[in-house]
Every structure is written in C-alpha cells, then in structure tokens.
Swiss-Prot record:
Protein name: U6 snRNA-associated Sm-like protein LSm6
Major site of localization recorded for this protein: cytoplasm
Gene Ontology CC entries for this record: Lsm1-7-Pat1 complex; nucleolus; P-body; sno(s)RNA-containing ribonucleoprotein complex; spliceosomal complex; U4/U6 x U5 tri-snRNP complex; U6 snRNP
Domain Sm as annotated: residue spans: 13-83
Keyword tRNA processing: yes
The protein's role, per its UniProt record: Component of LSm protein complexes, which are involved in RNA processing and may function in a chaperone-like manner, facilitating the efficient association of RNA processing factors with their substrates. Component of the cytoplasmic LSM1-LSM7 complex, which is thought to be involved in mRNA degradation by activating the decapping step in the 5'-to-3' mRNA decay pathway. Component of the nuclear LSM2-LSM8 complex, which is involved in splicing of nuclear mRNAs.
Keyword entries, A-Z: Cytoplasm, mRNA processing, mRNA splicing, Nucleus, Ribonucleoprotein, RNA-binding, rRNA processing, Spliceosome, tRNA processing
Gene it is expressed from: LSM6
Alphabetized Gene3D superfamilies for the sequence: 2.30.30.100
BP terms from Gene Ontology: deadenylation-dependent decapping of nuclear-transcribed mRNA; maturation of SSU-rRNA; mRNA splicing, via spliceosome; tRNA processing
Length: 83
C-alpha cells in the first residue's frame, strides 16, 4: 500500500475473495484449457468447486450446459468473478 492507496496485487486474501463471490457468476479455467461458467455455490480449502447453471466452453465454443457441476480442485488453474 502506497500513500494509503491499494495498488494492483494488494488487497484481499484468496479465501475472503472466494467467500464474497459465493452466489455470483464466475469463470473457472482448468489446467486442460476447458472453461466452466456458472453460479458459484461453494468452494473448499482444496479448491473443489460446485457450480449451478454451469456451461462448459472448449476453444471458445459452448459445448454443454449442466444444472449442477462439480470441479475437482487439482484441475483448477483459476477462478475469476464475472463482471
């Protein structure tokens, strides 16, 4: 923090960020490059993720829709809050 202002890279720890986005739309990218978009229902300490209204995207193309999806944490590259 410089001069009382947050700079990029500073801020909340990942646990509080994930807690705040529960119930919001997120994008989850897997190590394989596959992307899931959906409403974040839960995430645990191992980064296991439960999504509702999930969509699977491969190479920029929507492939499937799921009512619920569970993603094992060791496959997750990142989770991003959707704008």
């Amino acid at each position: 923090m410089e001069n009382g202002t947050m700079t990029q890279g500073e801020g909340k720890d990942p646990t509080s960020f994930l807690g705040e986005i529960i119930g919001n739309m997120v994008t989850v990218k897997l190590n394989s490059g596959v992307i899931y978009k959906g409403e974040l229902q839960s995430v645990d300490g191992y980064m296991n993720i439960a999504l509702e209204k999930a969509e699977e995207w491969v190479a920029g193309q929507k492939k499937r829709s799921y009512g619920d999806a569970f993603v094992r944490g060791n496959n997750v590259m990142y989770i991003a809050a959707s704008p």
